[in-house]
């Protein structure tokens, strides 16, 4: 744990250092204002200006600074109406939502008043005003969305969203001439994004009849020439120009397109999901700037040829923050996402020896099993990672190791635990928690007979709200996990399963329409959080699902997503570094979920400051109460003091991000963890369980009679045997 903390501290230092270095960098706007994000950007000369929620920021010569402080406008950014109070109105008027430039001057636009400002010397100076009807649709009383903004040849180009509720996807290009104050609307339809052009008024991307980027002439209102057609589902984000060539971002790559339509990969940016409407900019020196959340990525595209970075191709999904932070710490390695997440295509890529895929993130149970069993995964011989992997819960080790060889590392864990509202359960004196389905049905009977009328806002268990087919599906899933053998065979023609189905049939009246229960469940059949979470001060406590029969050990079934390396990859050393990085930087909760050795509680980062503020406010109220002589005012202060004390008690419930009690409860449950990753009937990544579910729906959609149990079992067995034969 000490090592992890040291690494995290080092990472913060590295991020700060990298963000202000020359070359390819990632500016982090939270370094100048907490919670800041980049909304809009443009270059004026060699200075990059970025508009965020709280200000306009400038980056020049490796220095990031605040150019204009707009933090007082934060509360008014989405207020469409001008406040009546003049002080508030003066702040509202400067709540700009976009910045743009003519190459010499920086401008900002207020999206509701239509006021255009010059941004100079740390201030917003009114410059000109858009006609009201450009942005405001009077007939339907709403403001049009501004999807794109750029300026060229003295004209402001605004790509606007729909002007009527019947055509939600409609866009319209409005052109405002600064000199004449005239407004023109383009007749071109299907425009999705715009950018400042070179040798033309504008670059537009249309997605109407064709997926095409055009050079646009405002005087003729025509697309003069085609820049390029895009294939398939590709869409350009962050369009800009550099030395007469189009530059845009798609699929983690910054492309440069020449006049013949040929494109080169000039750089990589760790953004998996790019929006067409995202604006970008490129300086005269060839530094391309692309915003994403709190970061602005700068990439030098001035060098000849394509990027020489080591590129790892990942098939699967990881946290976007993980990719961003890895790229900052390892600028020489780019991780890009493959186009598909389809499990069969993952296996096909491995089977064919496709060396273009370096990394997989696959599910267990699911695609992981075939990759492991058929030898498609590379050994991960990173010593520190292997040592760490051997400290994980045994059920996880059983999945990721092949003997002593590490084949992958878990990056997320999905648990099939249940949850009980411990607070209300104890308040209602409901006794012991049920540990078998028979006990659960008995508890439901007692609830319906003795509690339901008195507690209409609650119900005993959510299985009362899912129908017999949902209940049987849950039981079958647990039965398969417990009884499927190593070859993938499972028989439902057993006394255990037959008795259980008979029990369901005998108790189906509990789930009949006359016993419908739609209050908040005291027992929920899903995982709500690590150990203990809170809902309106009620303690929601993790519990193990009931067993199928009395005397059985309660178990905790789980699925994991495993990051692993393709045996065909030619970049395995870089891939190992990425896996090790991800393992080291998993989110805190996942670290606790997979490591039994992590037992130190974690205090909430906001707890102390919040508690100090509330206690200070309470002391002020108590002082005022002690000095107050007016009885009526004292009564009011008493109410305020009581309310403040309740707030303090509520905050104290949230003292811990990870509490000692949560750790104890989770570790006790996780000792019974099993991951049936070899199952042919897993509900994650296999058709086998889907076929069983179809049988259950056929026989149980309207309930289950005892006379139907044999037929249900026969059909489940038939499907189970068929799945077994297909896999052998």
Where does each model-flagged region fall?
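Extracytoplasmic/periplasmic solute-binding protein
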Residues: 407-411, 416, 439-491, 515-523
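Surface-exposed loop and turn segments in beta-propeller and other repeat-based domains
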Residues: 68-90, 128-142, 271-272
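Extracytoplasmic "Venus flytrap"/periplasmic binding protein-like
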Residues: 332-392, 426-428, 519-520, 530-535
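Extracytoplasmic/periplasmic substrate-recognition and gating elements
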Residues: 534-612, 623-632
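Glycine-centered hinge/linker elements that transmit conformational signals in sensory
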Residues: 444, 473-515, 536-548
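Conserved N-terminal structural module of periplasmic/extracytoplasmic solute-binding proteins
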Residues: 22-23, 27, 31-42, 49-50, ...
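Hinge/lid segment of periplasmic solute-binding proteins
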Residues: 365-417, 541-545
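Conserved C-terminal helix/tail region of periplasmic/extracytoplasmic solute-binding proteins
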Residues: 290-292, 605-728
């Amino acid at each position: 744990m000490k090592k992890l903390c040291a690494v995290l501290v080092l990472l913060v230092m590295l991020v700060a250092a990298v963000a202000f270095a020359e070359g390819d960098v990632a500016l982090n706007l939270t370094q100048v204002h907490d919670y800041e994000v980049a909304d809009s950007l443009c270059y004026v000369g060699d200075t990059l200006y970025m508009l965020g929620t709280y200000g306009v920021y400038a980056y020049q010569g490796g220095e990031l600074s605040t150019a204009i402080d707009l933090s007082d406008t934060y509360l008014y950014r989405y207020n469409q109406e001008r406040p009546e109070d003049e002080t508030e109105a003066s702040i509202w008027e400067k709540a700009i939502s976009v910045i743009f430039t003519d190459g010499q001057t920086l401008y900002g636009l207020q999206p509701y008043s239509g006021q255009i400002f010059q941004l100079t010397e740390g201030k917003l100076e009114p410059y000109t005003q858009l006609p009201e009807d450009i942005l405001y649709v009077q007939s339907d009383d709403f403001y049009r969305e501004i999807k794109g903004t750029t300026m060229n040849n003295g004209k402001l180009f605004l790509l606007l969203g729909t002007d009527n509720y019947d055509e939600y996807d409609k866009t319209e290009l409005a052109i405002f001439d600064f000199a004449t104050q005239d407004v023109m609307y383009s007749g071109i339809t299907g425009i999705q994004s715009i950018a400042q052009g070179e040798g033309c008024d504008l670059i537009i991307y249309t997605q109407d009849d064709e997926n095409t980027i055009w050079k646009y002439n405002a005087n003729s209102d025509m697309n003069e020439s085609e820049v390029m057609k895009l294939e398939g589902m590709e869409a350009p984000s962050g369009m800009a120009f550099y030395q007469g060539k189009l530059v845009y971002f798609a699929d983690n790559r910054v492309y440069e397109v020449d006049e013949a339509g040929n494109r080169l990969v000039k750089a990589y940016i760790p953004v998996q999901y790019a929006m067409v409407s995202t604006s970008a900019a490129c300086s005269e020196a060839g530094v391309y700037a692309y915003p994403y959340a709190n970061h602005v990525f700068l990439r030098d595209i001035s060098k000849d040829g394509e990027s020489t970075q080591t590129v790892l191709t990942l098939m699967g999904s990881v946290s976007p923050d993980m990719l961003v932070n890895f790229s900052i710490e390892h600028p020489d390695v780019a991780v890009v996402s493959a186009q598909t997440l389809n499990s069969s295509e993952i296996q096909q890529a491995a089977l064919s020896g496709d060396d273009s895929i370096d990394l997989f993130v696959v599910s267990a149970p699911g695609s992981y099993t075939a990759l492991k069993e058929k030898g498609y995964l590379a050994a991960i011989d990173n010593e520190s990672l292997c040592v760490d992997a051997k400290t994980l819960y045994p059920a996880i080790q059983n999945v990721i190791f092949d003997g002593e060889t590490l084949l992958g590392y878990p990056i997320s864990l999905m648990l099939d635990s249940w949850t009980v509202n411990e607070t209300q359960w104890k308040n209602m004196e409901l006794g012991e928690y049920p540990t078998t389905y028979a006990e659960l049905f008995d508890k439901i009977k007692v609830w319906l007979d003795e509690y339901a009328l008195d507690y209409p806002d609650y119900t005993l268990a959510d299985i009362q709200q899912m129908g017999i087919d949902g209940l049987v599906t849950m039981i079958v899933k647990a039965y398969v996990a417990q009884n499927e053998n190593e070859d993938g065979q499972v028989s439902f023609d057993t006394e255990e399963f037959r008795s259980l189905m008979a029990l369901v049939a005998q108790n189906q009246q509990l789930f009949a329409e006359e016993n419908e229960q739609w209050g908040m469940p005291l027992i929920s059949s899903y995982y709500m959080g690590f150990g203990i979470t809170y809902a309106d001060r009620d303690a929601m406590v993790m519990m193990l699902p009931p067993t199928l029969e009395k005397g059985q050990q309660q178990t905790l079934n789980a699925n994991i997503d495993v990051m692993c390396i393709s045996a065909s990859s030619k970049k395995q050393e870089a891939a190992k570094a990425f896996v090790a990085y991800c393992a080291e930087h998993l989110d805190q909760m996942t670290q606790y979920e997979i490591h039994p050795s992590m037992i130190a509680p974690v205090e909430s980062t906001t707890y102390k400051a919040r508690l100090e503020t509330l206690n200070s406010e309470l002391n002020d109220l108590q002082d005022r109460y002690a000095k107050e002589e007016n009885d009526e005012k004292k009564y009011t202060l008493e109410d305020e003091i009581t309310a403040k004390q309740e707030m303090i008690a509520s905050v104290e419930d949230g003292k811990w991000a990870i509490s000692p009690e949560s750790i104890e409860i989770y570790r006790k449950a996780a000792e019974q963890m099993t991951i049936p990753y070899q199952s042919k009937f897993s509900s994650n990544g296999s058709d086998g369980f889907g076929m069983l579910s179809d049988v259950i729906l056929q026989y149980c959609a309207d309930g289950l009679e005892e006379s139907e149990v044999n037929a249900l079992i026969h059909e489940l067995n038939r499907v189970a045997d068929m799945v077994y034969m297909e896999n052998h």
